[in-house]
């Protein structure tokens, strides 16, 4: 075995947190950090999952994940990643306080569209501490107050990797399966298919929400995910493996 097929088989041998830790290490250990992998994993995993990933990372690679991220990233992108990895986010069982969410929607507006320049600190504080349910509620209040979708606001107020990270946090909070469906569509671009991304998402979500991802993919793009994957795998063994995973009920 070699190449992409080997990577996929190896990925199936790990638990989800072990696989995530391995992906994060590979994303930072090689020459040039793969920020997309950091965003995809750190923005979408629960505080409990991130805690376990940090433990596995320390055990397997003898490195503190937070310190490693600090050494391999920079600027506000680094600050947001580190804030999330502190695992201070509420879990989804945390009660949603409507008043607090309303106030924080106003704070986001005041720190972004409502002023000259952007207060990145208030965005980081809220995005790195609130549960998915709270973020969805904040997004609803933001739309009611400003008349704009918060994802559109992030698009206009930020740039680069920070923008991608903030958008990923909110997109997955609103609909995690839809977020991964869009990532898979990017990976299945016929012009430049990204097999590493395909492997990463299909393997890591195979025991989580792949059925929902397939449905979101069809709803968005009016084509079955498995058909796009067949076109882009470019390896008969990898294609068969993907099809076997995607055909599971």
Where do the PLM segments sit?
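Structural signature for extended repeat/solenoid scaffolds and their inter-repeat hinge/linker regions
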Residues: 1-249
